[in-house]
Swiss-Prot record:
CDD domains: SANT. It is found in: Nucleus. Its main location: nucleus. The keyword DNA-binding applies. SUPFAM superfamilies: Homeodomain-like. Residues 110-119 have a biased composition (Pro residues). The modification Phosphoserine is found at S96. This is BPTF-associated chromatin complex component 1.
Amino acid sequence: MTSASTKVGEIFSAAGAAFTKLGELTMQLHPVADSSPAGAKWTETEIEMLRAAVKRFGDDLNHISCVIKERTVAQIKATVKRKVYEDSGIPLPADSPKKGPKKVASGVLSPPPTAPPPSSSSVPEAGGPPIKKQKADVTLSALNDSDANSDLVDIEGLGETPPTKKLNFDQA
């Protein structure tokens, strides 16, 4: 069995050959003035076949890119979710990893169904974990948001009172 890097190398070799062939076809499509034979002219059907082949190639690459991007985002979300559960001391739910956390109307994650009640003895001190849990909820909400760049939240210093700044508009 060949390694993944060997397979990728073979793919790029095949892509190089395909682009070489595309270059040759392009040169045939745009012949130099009088040096080409009369039969070298492309028909509309042949040009359309080439256009369709190049378009399919681009579409296929875009599809592959989307699949990889979705898988990568899902892996990042799963890793962050697992880290949040580990940091908060709550066991990771046993449900399918493909299911994302559910949002409630306020945009904050609902508590996991397998989480122990707050009054149980397995919950650590009341001072530390709630702050971590609050930060984790905001982070997961931002990651699960469909428009990832519109609602990014800076969670550093969350819970701290920011220093008050007064602006003096009376200065000339």
